[in-house]
């Protein structure tokens, strides 16, 4: 499959870089959280509140199965999608996985800078929770095909495109 799959922590820039990559490569952008919101006709926050996290993770698995048929897409995943049900391996079969690595200190700055009411796992700007999440997820994220330190927007885009072309053998 010739897709680019962006993974990483919440606030790592997956949606922002995904939008720009889709323009550069002339690929459609798929945001897994947006797809789930459209399927359920509810926000992620509402889904978590009404049905719980397990239900949400089941919906992510449904999305992964749909994505197996896609090609020439930039896929921006929710931060937890690669973590559950060994989804990282499914994502690697869907396309070229890119872990957008952002230092924890930078993630905390980004979280504190804004109120993230739409992100149920980041409610109350709980830096300790973010730190725990980071520690628990990093090992799985690092199984991606490539790791891009996303502290500079333009540099990250260039590195992702180069790594993707190399992976494709171009």
UniProtKB/Swiss-Prot annotation:
One of its GO terms (cellular component) is cytosol. Its cofactor is Mg(2+). ATP binds at residues 11-16, 119. It catalyses: shikimate + ATP = 3-phosphoshikimate + ADP + H(+). InterPro entries: P-loop_NTPase (IPR027417), Shikimate/glucono_kinase (IPR031322), Shikimate_kinase/TSH1 (IPR000623). Keywords: Amino-acid biosynthesis, Aromatic amino acid biosynthesis, ATP-binding, Cytoplasm, Kinase, Magnesium, Metal-binding, Nucleotide-binding, Transferase. Belongs to the shikimate kinase family. Monomer. Catalyzes the specific phosphorylation of the 3-hydroxyl group of shikimic acid using ATP as a cosubstrate. This is Shikimate kinase. It comes from Clostridium botulinum (strain Okra / Type B1).
């Amino acid at each position: 499959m010739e897709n680019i799959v962006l993974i990483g922590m919440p606030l790592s820039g997956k949606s922002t870089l995904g939008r720009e990559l889709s323009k550069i490569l002339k690929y459609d952008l798929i945001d897994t959280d947006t797809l789930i919101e459209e399927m359920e006709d509810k926000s992620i926050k509402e889904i978590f509140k009404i049905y719980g996290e397990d239900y949400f993770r089941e919906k992510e698995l449904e999305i992964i199965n749909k994505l197996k048929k896609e090609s020439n897409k930039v896929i921006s995943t929710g931060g937890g999608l690669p973590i559950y049900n060994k989804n990282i391996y499914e994502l690697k079969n869907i396309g070229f996985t890119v872990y957008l690595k952002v230092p924890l200190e930078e993630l905390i700055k980004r979280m504190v800078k804004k109120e993230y009411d739409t992100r149920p796992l980041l409610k109350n700007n709980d830096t300790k929770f973010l730190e725990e999440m980071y520690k628990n997820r990093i090992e799985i994220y690092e199984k991606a095909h490539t790791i891009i330190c996303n502290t500079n927007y333009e540099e990250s885009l260039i590195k992702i495109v180069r790594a993707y072309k190399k992976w494709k053998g171009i």
